[in-house]
Design a protein with these regions (language model features):
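Conserved beta-alpha junction segments in alpha/beta enzyme cores
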Residues: 25-115, 119-260, 264-272, 277-284, ...
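Bacterial N-terminal signal peptides that target proteins for export
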Residues: 1-10
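Selective for proline/serine-rich intrinsically disordered segments
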Residues: 5-6, 17, 416, 438
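Anionic-ligand-binding alpha/beta catalytic cores of soluble enzymes and soluble regulatory domains
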Residues: 289
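Bacterial N-terminal signal peptides
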Residues: 9-20
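Short linear motifs centered on Gly/Pro in flexible linkers and helix caps
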Residues: 1, 21-22
Length: 462
């Protein structure tokens, strides 16, 4: 009878190297990615600018995409990140999409984040900016919007399903860079921007951070997730486009073949890419942003251990004094067609037996990655004051590194979210835009403290 003998050399190898191999495997995440094109397949109306009316897009400058990244840590805890080259989606559509994903993949609400780039060169999605768009549409355009919204829902769900099918061992790392084209549009006159920038006299506040998350599989770049706090409003024509963010994603995918580049919009509700209105500028800003991301990738980055925590809360943020039915009746005769449309819609709501709510259920989501990155997802068009406050109070920030990430336009784009300062100053972000979103009045002065108190609670509960 022969016996297999274990050589002394193998024993030395096993004792020396196997523990480290097991440890290395413990340091890996499982990640999956997928992309689905969501460019409308037929001409339809475009979102974001009332001046476009019901005129349809005529061509495609660059395609629009839904993209998904699945993160799974060493304890099999999962998170689903979806990015969309769209202006935004509303609460109802977001809930429907999340419900389907939760049921199919056994997730809870905290594990799904849906982030819109806020491009103003995408299609109108049902439920968003109704007094600006849908309340004025003819039947044909309204049906196109409803059909596209169902197509979008299915596309997102398909994208998530496909990403789950590609889960594989991955390493995660992160860093942060800077890009400087975002400009505070409230405190700088657009025509003076070139001169102010050249003289170093642009007024703030602003947030020029570019957070970057890198996913590698077998040493190859699989996904790049990055954010920036600036409106996607370089373009205002009639071609589908992801604007500067779309160009940035395309350039990164060319630089790193085989990877999926995903953009999320930060707290740039009061930030514009200036100057603008030329395709050349959208390409230039996209290249500027892609270069900032690639510098992070090629520089010093930080590995993330496979630890994931997720939480989600909806907090009631208060409106100011609600209008009476008589006041709405008067507004319904306004020469401002958008104010009149909002008033008629709210009157219909009241007459159907649904009183105007004094609050709105505002979504706040928190992910912690590797016990290093504190990542907040806020709904609506959030002004920059929020990001600066959250980073100041909850992060370790210096000139080269930002470990607190603040995504806006996430899960529900219901309105502008002004800070108390901006609310009291007034103007478009301070309250004027509420008309276009169909909400009954401006926010109460407690809006900022309510949101930031909840942010504080979520980070302290982890």
């Amino acid at each position: 009878v022969s016996r297999n003998k274990i050589s002394p050399t193998f024993l030395v190898f096993a004792i020396t190297f196997l523990p480290s191999l097991v440890a290395a495997n413990d340091e890996l995440w499982n990640c999956g990615t997928a992309t689905v094109c969501i460019t409308p397949q037929q001409p339809m109306t475009m979102a974001g600018y009332a001046s476009r009316g019901e005129k349809h897009a005529t061509d495609t400058l660059n395609d629009l995409w839904a993209k998904t990244l699945i993160l799974e840590d060493a304890s099999n805890r999962r998170a689903v990140l979806v990015t969309l080259d769209l202006l935004g989606i509303d609460r109802k559509l977001s809930q429907r999409i999340c419900k389907s994903i939760m049921e199919k993949h056994g997730l809870d609400r905290s594990q799904i984040a849906i982030c819109s780039s806020h491009t103003h060169s995408g299609p109108v999605v049902a439920g968003t900016l109704r007094p600006m768009h849908a309340l004025h549409f003819n039947e044909s355009n309204l049906n196109l919007t409803l059909e596209y919204s169902e197509f979008l829902k299915q596309s997102i769900e398909d994208c998530v399903d496909q990403a789950f099918e590609t889960l594989a061992p991955s390493s995660l790392s992160w860093g942060s860079g800077s890009a400087t084209f975002a400009t505070n549009r409230r405190n700088n006159t657009e025509k003076n921007i070139p001169k102010l920038r050249a003289s170093g006299k642009l007024a703030g506040p602003y947030d020029h951070d570019v957070p970057v998350l890198m996913v590698r599989q077998d040493g190859k770049m699989k996904a790049i997730v990055f954010g920036y706090a600036c409106h996607c409003t370089v373009l205002s024509g009639f071609e589908w486009s992801g604007d500067y963010a779309g160009f940035a994603q395309s350039e990164l995918e060319d630089l790193y073949p085989g990877c999926v580049a995903m953009f999320w919009a930060g707290c740039g509700g009061d930030q514009n890419p200036l100057p603008r209105r030329k395709v050349e500028l959208a390409r230039r800003y996209g290249s500027h942003l892609a270069h900032a991301v690639s510098q992070v990738i090629e520089g010093s980055t930080h590995d993330l251990s496979p630890e994931l925590q997720t939480s989600y809360r909806e907090v009631d943020i208060a409106f100011g004094t609600l209008p009476t039915r008589d006041e709405l009746q008067a507004q319904s005769a306004s020469q401002n067609r958008y104010e009149a449309a909002r008033a008629r819609s709210l009157i219909e709501q009241i007459d159907s037996g649904q009183e105007l709510s004094p609050t709105y259920p505002y979504p706040i989501q928190f992910w912690n990655l590797g016990d290093e990155i504190n990542w907040f997802f806020l709904g609506g068009e959030v002004v920059v004051d929020y990001a600066l406050s959250i980073k100041s109070n909850h992060g370790e920030t210096n000139a080269d590194l930002t470990d607190v990430w603040c995504t806006a336009y996430a899960n529900d784009v219901m309105a502008y979210i002004p800070s108390r300062r901006v609310l009291l100053e007034g103007g478009y972000e301070g309250g004027g835009a509420m008309i276009y979103y169909g909400l009954p009045t401006i926010w109460d002065e407690t809006v900022e403290s309510t949101i930031l108190d909840t942010v504080h609670q979520l980070i302290n509960e982890r």
